[in-house]
């Protein structure tokens, strides 16, 4: 059975290939339309607002794929600390191994940094919350879980952009040492 690819996904796939080939700054709508095998007018019908709307859709899709992969990678999570270590380890390893992200940071640093900070952070936090918050319901109430996920995502991005001399989030022992006091702040204190 052949999988049916929506026209939108076909355009997003083409956009990804074009970005990988030429980088973001030199890319035109015509390049993407040609790669997707559609007209420029069709691309604008699929993504009213053009390039910006299309790249927003691509970023959201890639974030969803990233967090879906993260969710699928979790194994035997017995505690909030274990969850934090596994999530951070997955995220750091994926970001370090992302050739496209590395290329963007090397050649189009301003664009890449904006997508991880000023412009992109609210989107990253929203998608992280959608995917990760439900996974920690057994450890925290919903309001705490939402705050925890936001702080965890901010920490991981910070450690990726400015690696620490003291902690490596890809190393489970190092990540455990970092996250133990962080997680303790969210755990109920035993009274008595």
Describe the function of each predicted region.
Residues 25-26, 52-53, 82, 103, ...:
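Residue-level preference for short helical/loop micro-motifs built around acidic side chains
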Residues 1-6, 186-192:
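N-terminal intrinsically disordered/low-complexity leader segments
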Residues 57, 69-97, 149:
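Hydrophobic alpha-helical connector segments
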Residues 10, 18-53, 57:
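Helix-turn-helix
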Residues 93-97, 152-169, 182-191:
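Amphipathic C-terminal alpha-helical segment
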Residues 7-15, 32, 58-66, 70:
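Generic hydrophobic, amphipathic alpha-helix propensity
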Residues 67, 99, 103, 112-150:
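Amphipathic alpha-helical packing segments from all-alpha helical-bundle domains
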């Amino acid at each position: 059975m052949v999988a049916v690819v929506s026209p939108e996904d076909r355009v997003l796939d083409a956009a990804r290939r074009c970005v990988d080939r030429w980088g973001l700054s030199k890319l035109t709508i015509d390049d993407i339309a040609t790669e997707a095998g559609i007209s420029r007018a069709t691309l604008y019908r699929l993504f009213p607002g053009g390039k910006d709307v299309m790249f927003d859709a691509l970023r959201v899709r890639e974030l969803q794929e990233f967090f879906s992969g993260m969710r699928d990678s979790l194994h035997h999570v017995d505690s909030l600390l274990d969850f934090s270590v596994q999530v951070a380890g997955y995220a750091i390893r994926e970001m370090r191994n992302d050739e496209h992200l590395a290329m963007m940071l090397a050649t189009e640093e301003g664009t890449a940094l904006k997508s991880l900070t000023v412009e992109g952070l609210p989107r990253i936090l929203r998608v992280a919350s959608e995917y990760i918050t439900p996974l920690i319901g057994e450890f925290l109430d919903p309001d705490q879980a939402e705050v925890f996920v936001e702080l965890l995502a901010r920490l991981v991005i910070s450690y990726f952009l400015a690696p620490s001399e003291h902690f490596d989030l890809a190393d489970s022992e190092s990540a455990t040492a970092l996250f133990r006091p962080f997680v303790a702040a969210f755990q109920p204190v035993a009274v008595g």
